[in-house]
């Protein structure tokens, strides 16, 4: 998966809707994952 930003408000590269942002970039979709779900990952 491709890390594009953060799911935490106020954080660097904050993404309000991870799934929608990933789709906009041409990925299948996305989800918030990693430690405490802080990162937005796009599915290749």
Curated annotation (Swiss-Prot):
Expression sites by tissue: Hemolymph.
This protein's name: Defensin-like peptide
Organism for this UniProt entry: Galleria mellonella (Greater wax moth)
Transmembrane domains' residue ranges: none
Keywords, comma-separated and alphabetical: Antimicrobial, Defensin, Disulfide bond, Fungicide, Immunity, Innate immunity, Secreted
Domain of life: Eukaryota
PROSITE patterns in the cross-refs: INVERT_DEFENSINS
Tagged with keyword Secreted: yes
Role played: Has antibacterial activity against the Gram-positive bacterium S.lutea (MIC=1.9 uM). Lacks antibacterial activity against the Gram-positive bacteria L.monocytogenes and M.luteus, and the Gram-negative bacteria E.coli D31, E.coli ATCC 25922, and S.typhimurium.
């Amino acid at each position: 998966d491709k890390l594009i930003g953060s799911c935490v408000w106020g954080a660097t590269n904050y993404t309000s809707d991870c799934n929608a942002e990933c789709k906009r970039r041409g990925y299948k979709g996305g989800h918030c994952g990693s430690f405490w779900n802080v990162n937005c990952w796009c599915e290749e």
